C-alpha cells in the first residue's frame, strides 16, 4: 500500500455496467495521475496493523516474524514520492486527515497502491466520520474464480470496481461518498478517517476475500 489522498473532482460517477472503467490512460478510465491539480490535500496521520507474510501459512517467517515489515507507516503520508509501506495479507492502514473529506459532486478522494499493470495490489476501502464507526464501499470483481491466478498474472481493471489498487503505480483509484448508504453514524461531509484493508488474492475459501455482490480476487501474493 502506498498513498491515500483527498482531491476535488467535478465529474459524473462511474456507470455500473457489466464491466468497469479500463486501465489508466485508456478512453473512459477514471484513473487520476499523482501530479493532477485535482488533488488538494493529503493524509496527515496513520496507524498500521501489519498482516501475515502468507496467511495460508502463518508459520512462515522472515527474520523471526510471520508479519510483513517493509517500509514505515509515514511513507503513506503526503504526496506519492516512491517509498511505500507493506500491509501484508489482511493488514490494515487507517489514515486521518486534518482537512476532512466532504461529499461533493462526483469523486471525493482517491487511493494509491504500489502495484504494477501486471501485479495489482488490491484493497477494500472504508470511511468514518468519528474514528469508531466505519463504512465499506461496496466492491465488485468480475474476475474468474475457476482457476487460481498465478504469480505472474493479475486481475484486470475493467473487471474491478471500488477496490483500491485497480489502477497501478502513479494513478489513484477514485471513490465517491455518494455510493455509501445513508446512516446516522456517518457524516459524509466530515470524513476524518479512511481505512485500507488488504484483499487476499486467493480462491481458497479459507482465505479468499468476499464483499458486496461478488469479490473473488484470484491472485496469491506471498
Where are these regions (language model features)?
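Sec-dependent N-terminal signal peptides
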Residues: 4-13
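A domain-level signal for the mature, folded cores of soluble proteins
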Residues: 18-123, 133-222
Amino acid at each position: 500500500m502506498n498513498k491515500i489522498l483527498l482531491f476535488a473532482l467535478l465529474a459524473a460517477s462511474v456507470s455500473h455496467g457489466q464491466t468497469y472503467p479500463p486501465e489508466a490512460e485508456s478512453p473512459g478510465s477514471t484513473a487520476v495521475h499523482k501530479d493532477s491539480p485535482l488533488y488538494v490535500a493529503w493524509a496527515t496521520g496513520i496507524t498500521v496493523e501489519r498482516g501475515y507474510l502468507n496467511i495460508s501459512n502463518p508459520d512462515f517467517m522472515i527474520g523471526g516474524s510471520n508479519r510483513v515489515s517493509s517500509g514505515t507507516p509515514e511513507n503513506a503520508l503526503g504526496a506519492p514520492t516512491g517509498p511505500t509501506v507493506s500491509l501484508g495479507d489482511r493488514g490494515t492502514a487507517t489514515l486521518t486527515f486534518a482537512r476532512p473529506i466532504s461529499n461533493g459532486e462526483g469523486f471525493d478522494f482517491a487511493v494509491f497502491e504500489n502495484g504494477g499493470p501486471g501485479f495489482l495490489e488490491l484493497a477494500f476501502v472504508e470511511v468514518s466520520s468519528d474514528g469508531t464507526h466505519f463504512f465499506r464501499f461496496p466492491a465488485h470483481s468480475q474476475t474468474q474464480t475457476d482457476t487460481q491466478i498465478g504469480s505472474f498474472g493479475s486481475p484486470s481493471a475493467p473487471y474491478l470496481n471500488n477496490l483500491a489498487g485497480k489502477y497501478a503505480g502513479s494513478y489513484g483509484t477514485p471513490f465517491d461518498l455518494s455510493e455509501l448508504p445513508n446512516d446516522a453514524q456517518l457524516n459524509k461531509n466530515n470524513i476524518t478517517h479512511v481505512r485500507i484493508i488488504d484483499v487476499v488474492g486467493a480462491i481458497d475459501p479459507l482465505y479468499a476475500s468476499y464483499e458486496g455482490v461478488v469479490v473473488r480476487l484470484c491472485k496469491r501474493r506471498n
